């Protein structure tokens, strides 16, 4: 045989191996295991050794232990989502209750009539109100007192700083 034909045969074989190596050597047939017989939570698995290899690379001693582990893994991920949902259900209302307080209150204007009877007796709380004069008042009471003193020339723009 000529040397050139040996090299060409070797080249063809190497190309074939390179093209089909993944399917020929790496991928094993993926079997779908029916876990329905093992779904009852009271059943215990036997200790017989008929190994089942999972896609995660872990080997289980038989179908029953594989299905139990799969069910527990599915349950733990579902429990994780339940925990996340529960935490979000607790945290989100507190966060948005404080964050959107101004947008909820922006729909109603301060009732300045209740401050006419006791003028200039305001608390020092910080719940800012923006007036149409561009000034930020520390709270509704201070705003209403300024509005009454200015003979209603100042009007309410929105809750929050200007």
From Swiss-Prot:
Expressed in epydiymis, in the cauda and corpus. Also expressed in brain. SUPFAM superfamilies: Kazal-type serine protease inhibitors. GO terms for cellular component: membrane. The keyword Manganese does not apply. It is found in: Membrane. It is a multi-pass membrane protein. Keywords: Disulfide bond, Membrane, Protease inhibitor, Repeat, Serine protease inhibitor, Transmembrane, Transmembrane helix. InterPro entries: Kazal_dom (IPR002350), Kazal_dom_sf (IPR036058), Prot_inh_Kazal-m (IPR001239). The chain crosses the membrane at residues 6-26, 80-100. Probable serine protease inhibitor. This is Serine protease inhibitor Kazal-type 10. It comes from Mus musculus (Mouse). The gene is Spink10.
